[in-house]
Amino acid sequence: MEKVVYKMNTESKLLDRKILRSGHKIDQSLLWMVVLMVSFSLLMIYSASIAYAAQDGGDKWFYLSRQAVFLVAGGIAGSIAAKIPMAKWKKWTPIILTFSLALLVAVLFMGREINGAKRWIHMGPVNVQPSEIFKLAVILYLSSFFTRRAEILKQFKKVGFVGVPIVIGLWLLMLEPDFGSVVVVSVIFLSLLFLAGLPNKWFALVILLSVGLLGMLIMLEPYRMARVTAFLDPWEDPLGKGYQLTHSLMAIARGEWFGVGLGSSLEKRFYLPEAHTDFILAVIGEEFGFVGICVLMFCYCWIGWRAFSIGKQARDLELFYGAFVAKG
C-alpha cells in the first residue's frame, strides 16, 4: 500500500512529461462505437418523435434537427477537450467543481420549472442542466483527491472530509429536486472509493449508510414511494401511477423477438408519454424487439469495458489521475 501511495503522490511530477512523450491518441474502437451509438440515437429520436413533432409545430424533423445541432456542438467541444492535457484538467478541477456548485445554486433561482422540478437553466437557444456538469466535476474532484491524498484512505475518520463538497452538491440536488442525479452521484462516489482502495470493512459501512439514507429519502416523499411501488407492480394501477410502465411493457411485448420494424411503433403515437425522451427504450424494444435491446445493452457494456481497459492502461503507465477519470 505504501508503494502505491508513493507512486500516486509522485504522479503530478511525471504526468506532463509522459503525456508529451505518448501524445494524444484516441482509442479508435471506442470512437467508432460511440459514432455508431450516436447515429443510432439520431435514427431513434426521429422515429420516436414524429408524432410529437407534428403536434408541436408540424415539422417532423424538429427533434432530429435540434439533436443534430447539439451533436455537432458536443462533437466540437469533445474534440477540444480531448486535446487538453490531463495535467491541466487536474489543475482546473477546483475551478470546475466550484463552478458546478455555483450552477446548482443558480438553478434554484433561475431554473426553468418542468413537471414541478427546477433542473434546467435557460441560456438563449439552449437549456443547461447543472447536475450533468456536477457529475463530471465529482469524477474530476475525486480522481484528483485520491491521486494527491491516497494515504487518507487509511484513516476512516478523514474519508468523510473527501465528501464535503459532494454532500453540498447532493443537498442542492435534493432542493431541485432531482433524486435520480442524487443516486447517480452517490454511485460515482462509492465506485471511486472502492477503486481507490478503501478497506473492505469501511467500504461496506459506507454502502450501508448510503443505502439507508437513500431509502429514508424515498420514504419521506410520497411521490417517490409511489414510483417505487409502481415499479414493483405497475399493473396495480395501470391507468394511474403505473401508466407509463405498463405501456412500456406493452411496447416491448409487442416487439417480441425482432420487433415490428423501424417506424412501426404504435405506443409512440401518444399512448406512451415521453416516448421520444425518457421512455425511448420502449420504442426501441417495440421496433427492434428483444434482440435489438440486447444488442443495445451489449454496446453500452462494451463502451464501459473499453473505458475500464483504458483506465487500466493509464494505471500501468502510472497515470493514476487519468485512470480514475476513465473508470469514473
PLM feature spans:
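Short, Lys/Arg-rich, polar N-terminal cytosolic tail immediately upstream
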Residues: 1-23
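N-terminal membrane topogenic signal
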Residues: 20-34
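Hydrophobic alpha-helical transmembrane segments of multi-pass inner membrane proteins, especially
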Residues: 31-39, 47, 56-244, 282-328
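Extracytosolic (periplasmic/ER-lumenal) interhelical loops and adjacent juxtamembrane/interface segments
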Residues: 242-263
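Short linear Ser/Thr-Pro motifs
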Residues: 47-50, 265
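Long extracytoplasmic/lumenal interhelical loops at the membrane interface
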Residues: 256-288, 311-317
